[in-house]
C-alpha cells in the first residue's frame, strides 16, 4: 500500500426485487453521498435483489442487470479515487454466476464469481447459479469490453495502492475460505458481499469467522 489509510463503507441500499432501475438509482445515490470514501461495498446481488428466485432465469432481467452495471461504472468517472464493488448476476459460457463486480474510474475492472453455492435450509442458490470454483485466467466480453473473469483476481485500489480481494457470502462460511488464499496471494483488504438473513447469534458468529 502506498498509503496506510483507506476509508471504506459498507453500503446498505433500499432495494426492490427485480426492479433494476430503482436499485441502480439507489446504488448511484449512495455512491454520490459517500464519494469521499476510497472503497464502497454493496450487498450480494444488489443490482437485482437477492430474492429474485426463478426470475434469475429471465434473459430480460439479466440484460438489464448488465446494462445497470455499466451505468453504475459510468457514474464513477468523476470519482477517480474511488473503488466500488457491487453484486450482479452474470452469464458466462452458458452458466449463471453470482458475481462481485469491481468498478473504478468509469470501468468494470473485474468480475469475481461466488465459489460456494449454498443449498440447505432457506438457501437454494444451486437452482439458478453455478459455482465459480476452478474458473481462473478467463475474460468475458460485455458491451464491447473485455473484462477479467475468475476467482484468481486481485484488484489494486488506484488511490491507496491497497490490493483488494472479493468473496461472496457463503464463501466466508466454509473451512477452505477463498479469503485465505487471497491473503496468501497478497490482498490487504478482503470484502465479502452478503445478502444473509439474520438469526439470533449469527452476527457474533460472523465476527468470529473473521477474527
Tell me what each language-model feature is.
Residues 1-211:
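Enzyme catalytic cores with a strong preference for nitrogen-chemistry domains
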Amino acid at each position: 500500500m502506498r498509503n496506510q489509510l483507506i476509508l471504506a463503507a459498507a453500503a446498505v441500499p433500499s432495494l426492490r426485487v427485480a426492479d433494476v432501475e430503482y436499485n441502480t438509482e439507489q446504488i448511484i445515490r449512495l455512491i454520490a453521498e459517500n464519494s469521499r470514501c476510497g472503497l464502497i461495498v454493496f450487498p450480494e446481488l444488489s443490482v437485482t435483489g437477492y430474492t429474485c428466485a426463478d426470475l434469475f432465469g429471465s434473459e430480460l432481467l439479466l440484460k438489464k442487470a448488465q446494462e445497470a452495471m455499466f451505468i453504475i461504472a459510468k457514474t464513477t468517472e468523476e470519482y477517480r479515487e474511488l473503488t466500488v464493488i457491487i453484486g450482479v448476476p452474470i452469464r458466462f459460457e452458458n452458466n449463471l454466476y453470482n458475481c462481485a463486480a469491481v468498478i473504478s474510474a468509469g470501468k468494470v475492472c473485474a468480475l469475481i464469481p461466488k465459489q460456494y453455492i449454498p443449498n440447505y435450509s432457506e438457501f437454494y442458490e444451486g437452482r439458478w447459479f453455478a459455482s465459480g470454483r476452478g474458473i481462473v485466467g478467463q475474460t468475458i466480453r460485455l458491451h464491447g469490453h473485455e473484462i477479467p473473469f475468475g476467482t484468481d483476481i486481485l484488484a489494486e485500489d488506484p488511490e491507496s495502492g491497497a490490493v483488494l480481494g472479493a468473496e461472496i457470502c457463503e464463501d466466508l462460511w466454509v473451512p477452505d475460505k477463498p479469503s485465505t488464499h487471497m491473503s496468501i496471494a497478497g490482498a490487504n483488504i478482503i470484502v465479502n458481499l452478503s445478502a444473509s438473513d439474520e438469526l439470533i447469534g449469527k452476527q457474533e458468529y460472523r465476527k468470529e469467522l473473521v477474527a
